[in-house]
Amino acid sequence: MNSDKAMKGVERAPHRSLFKALGFIDEEMDRPLIGIANSYSELIPGHMNLDKIVKAVKDGIRMAGGVPVEFGTIGVCDGISMNHKGMSYSLPSRQIIADSVEIVAKAHALDGLVLVPNCDKVVPGMLMAAGRVNIPSIVISGGPMLSGRTNGRVTDLNSVFEAVGAVSAGKMSLEELAELENTACPTCGSCSGMFTANSMNCLSEVLGLALPYNGTIPAVFSERLRLAKKAGMKIVELVQKDIRPSDILTEAAFMNAVAMDMALGGSTNSLLHLPAIAYECDVDINFDKINEISEKIPHVCKLSPAGFHHIEDLHMAGGIPAVVNGIIKKGLLNGECMTVTGKTLYENVKDAKIKNIDVIRIDNPYSETGGLSVLRGNLAPDGAIVKKAAVAPEMMQHTGPARVFNSEEEVSKAILGGKINPGDVVVIRYEGPKGGPGMKEMLSPTASLAGMGLDKSVALITDGRFSGATRGASIGHVSPEAAEGGPIGLVEEGDTIEIDIEKKTINLLVPEEKLKNRKPEKVEKPVKGYLNTYRQGVSSACTGAVFHSTKE
């Protein structure tokens, strides 16, 4: 076993002495040493139950004959860090999570890893670590929050963000906002729509690194604890059979994940995270492949923010296995990929049934193409991402005057100050991976537009990114970013921008000769500490905003 490096032989007597200081007995040193990466936090609603998940995982490991050892990782709540400087640290935290899991696993010669994430950057960060470390690994997440009930209406966190705009527009009272604030997030768990955390937790099933139903069992269900025990038992089996992430996280598995992302209408952030995870596994996911898959895969689920259903509805309708089974039967997924169950993807789901055809619409899809698209044009030569599943029909084609801002803070003031008009195209730049730095999410601006009733008449484009809760004609990840000399840095107030989501184009309607004579506005955003380190090392959003320095 890998742990023999730290436990076996005469020269390892000092090492064994330290293990015995931890309370180990000799018999435990002959068993698989399983690390549990626990991102428990009292700052993140989606992570406040992970102590219970980890206890169940430990029970499962011990039942199967392994020895569990728990260690901590950091995490950021994107909702709490939204719309202030804190959001600059969200995406950078993904790198630190991946690095920290790698460091602990390698430094202590672990035999296997149980990864216990739940929220936005923690799931991909841990999956990146699994690909990089490549010892037997399994993911067991904390589970989704239940949706709220506010005066008879089903609500979620996005309802509260949009309500801020509604209050500013005089469409909602402060009393109504307070009622919503108190009821929209009723339990622990990852926020209840098909937002980023739930998108990635669902895709971890499809990638094959999590057990079936990992993405949809609500955080407060006892079923979640039972799944955690099974994950603990399964990791010991994976170690014994030497089944590693490299056996599971293949190119075919990633293509399956992209396809399911399209079928589910997942978060735009998933198209930042999947390439980053693939990078650690030496698999290339580029925007051309993503668009090719998008053209073939029907959009079969429409959860919040695109629709009215939530993750608990998807779970009750049959969960990810039911969706996967339906898509495989249409010949659109590779069912032969290996998974942590030791079985193929199809073997995992072949008996899963759709229990609610209003939630999972395999035979009556919302559209014949996927819920996410990559746009290209002279404004985004390397691509930009839109969640077309959450775009109103009247905004699928839009042409309007540019309203240019160099930070999220500037645009938020303009929106809430009533300075954005129907027909405008809001441009937020210098918020990319390097320019921000940190590539902040723009949920507050998009939610404010929606709450003010402008989501069906105003488009928003940015070299930053969006929350999975964002809806409307919100186009992010514009690449190259302004800080790297991208054309978005040349846009001037009043320029005409043309967007055609169906044709996958985004163009600045300014003559090429005129653009050549423009110089980008110089925007300095000095930072220190980790953000400065991040700015120097991070790559473009179109390649997953990874650190190329992690490769030889």
From Swiss-Prot:
Mg(2+) binds at D78, D120, K121, E441. The active site is at S467 (proton acceptor). It is an enzyme of class 4 (lyase). The lineage of its organism: Bacteria, Bacillati, Bacillota, Clostridia, Eubacteriales. The keyword Cytoplasm does not apply. Signal peptide: none annotated. This is Dihydroxy-acid dehydratase. GO terms for cellular component: cytosol. InterPro entries: Dihydro-acid_dehy_C (IPR042096), DihydroxyA_deHydtase (IPR004404), DiOHA_6PGluconate_deHydtase_CS (IPR020558), ILV_EDD_C (IPR056740), ILV_EDD_N (IPR000581), IlvD/EDD_N (IPR037237). Binds 1 [2Fe-2S] cluster per subunit. This cluster acts as a Lewis acid cofactor. Homodimer. [2Fe-2S] cluster binds at C119, C191. Its EC number is 4.2.1.9. Its cofactor is [2Fe-2S] cluster; Mg(2+). The gene is ilvD. Keywords: 2Fe-2S, Amino-acid biosynthesis, Branched-chain amino acid biosynthesis, Iron, Iron-sulfur, Lyase, Magnesium, Metal-binding. Belongs to the IlvD/Edd family. Gene3D superfamilies: IlvD/EDD C-terminal domain-like. GO terms for molecular function: 2 iron, 2 sulfur cluster binding; dihydroxy-acid dehydratase activity; magnesium ion binding.
